[in-house]
Amino acid sequence: PPSLHRRQRQMCIRDRYLLAHPEIAHGPVRIGFTPDEEVGSGTDHFDVERFGAACAYTMDGETLGELQVETFSADSITATFNGFNTHPGFAKGKMVNAIKVAADFIARLPKDGLAPELTEGYEGFVHPYMMNSSVDSTSVKLLVRDFATPKLQEMERLVEQLALEAVDAWPGSSVEVKVEESYRNMKEVLDDHPDVVENACEAFRRAGMEPVIEPIRGGTDGSRLSFMGLPTPNIFAGEHNFHSRYEWISVQDMHKAVEVIIELCQVWEQRA
């Protein structure tokens, strides 16, 4: 994937530089690649103990100078609407179209907020992003996101309530709602490891920029890694327009990110 190749290039440049400059003092450096990050499985088989590091930094950020220490907390919901299919020519009084029930449910979702296209900053959202539909059964997958973990349950209760309302409007239908945890706000862990963030800030300054600390309206593998015992903030990599057809990356920002990594190695060695 392009995102993996991007990170590999950055790591290779950093490694070659450190090997070519043995005078640069640094402690042991561990390198990890999480190739399934974009589908939410990047840390499923990541062995933190074997990795053997006290902390880590993902290179998965956006604009030059950004340092991110908090992410969304995230769950996913699958709402499966069940209907009854029969031959459409003889369906009167028999057919219950699960596609229409699901459409009714989606139409009931808030239209004045709680949607990605209507929120910013620290605002959370509910986002229907995929459907698998037939008359008999239609499943709707939704993302639930907020920076405050307790708010996830509030939004999940709302989704379940709206799903039940849709079913009530279509006699003969039913619904099953399943909630799965995706990741949690890494700030809950990083607040207990201020040196991990402070050392990164110092590396930014040595590389000639003041860190811009802003929340990620999304997640990185650092979220899961932090809760697995490996505190992991996120550093910019020059990425823009994530997941869109217009995604692009700044080569200049990538090189600046490498400078930050090199400085970071030295900061940790000097402050050890």
Predicted regions and their residues:
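Single conserved hydrophobic/aromatic residue that forms the stacking wall/gate
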Residues: 1-13
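Metal-dependent amide/peptide-bond hydrolase catalytic core
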Residues: 98-272
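Hydrophobic core residues within well-ordered beta-strands of beta-rich domains
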Residues: 5, 75-77, 138
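Fold-level recognition of mixed alpha/beta catalytic cores in primary-metabolism enzymes, strongest
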Residues: 10, 14, 22-98
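Residue-level signal for alpha-helix termini/capping positions
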Residues: 20-23, 205
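N-terminal, charged/glycine-rich beta-strand/loop interface patches
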Residues: 17
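A generic structural micro-feature
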Residues: 3, 71-73, 134
